[in-house]
């Protein structure tokens, strides 16, 4: 009987510890890299998921190409965005609420939506 209680305790501790070490990911959205502009001036649109409308531009027109995008935002986290993603690529992301890293980004201009969101690309 003591062995059973001991083994049950070990099992419960193992399960509890596993839950404590799991990273909690926020809501995951599907996005598309619409414009891969110069110097990380990237425009992304939300194509799946119910994102807070106050975080994105309902409709935004690129003044260079005159193309209009819906649910668009500018990349707010250029330091950790994968260089392997190209314009037109779809990917999953969550809003990154951690402290943003500082990195060198050139100052060349390319138009982006006024609203910026720091995101983290996630594998789904």
Spell out what each predicted region is.
Residues 56-79:
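Disulfide-stabilized netrin-like
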Residues 72-93:
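Short nucleic-acid-contacting surface segments enriched for D/E, G, S/T with interspersed K/R
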Residues 96-102:
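Short, charged beta-turn/beta-strand-edge "cap" motif at the junction between a beta-strand
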Residues 1-20:
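Sec-dependent bacterial lipoprotein signal peptides
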